[in-house]
Amino acid sequence: MEYSLGLVEVSALGNAIIMLDDMLKAADVEFVATERKLGGRLVTIVVRGALTSVKASVDDGVAIATKYGCLKASQVIARPHHEIFKLLHLD
C-alpha cells in the first residue's frame, strides 16, 4: 500500500506526547518515528497513512501545538521517495 508521511515539530517532549495522542485519535494513522533534538526541547513526530488521514492528523496536531504555543513546523509528504525512509530509519 502506498502511503503518505506527516511531520509535526514542536518544542518540548511533553507537548509532543499530548499532541501525538490527539493526532492518533483524530485519524487512522500510525506513529512511525520521533526525532529529539536539543535534549528533548525540539521534537519531530512522524506519522503515516492514507493521504487524507495524514492530512487530518497533521491538521489536528497543528491545532493542538498552536493552542499550547509550541508549534515549530509541519509538513505532509504524499508518496514519499523510498530514500526518505533511510533518514527515518524505516528501510
PLM segments and residue spans:
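Short glycine-/aliphatic-rich beta-strand segments at the starts of folded cytosolic domains
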Residues: 1-10
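Short amphipathic alpha-helix segments
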Residues: 14-26
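A short linear hydrophobic-aromatic micro-motif
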Residues: 29-34, 73-74
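Helix N-cap motif at beta-to-alpha junctions
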Residues: 48-54
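Short amphipathic alpha-helices in soluble, non-transmembrane regions
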Residues: 57-63
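Conserved short beta-strand edge segments in small beta-sheet-based binding/regulatory domains
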Residues: 67-79
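Short, low-order "capping/linker" segments at domain edges
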Residues: 83-91
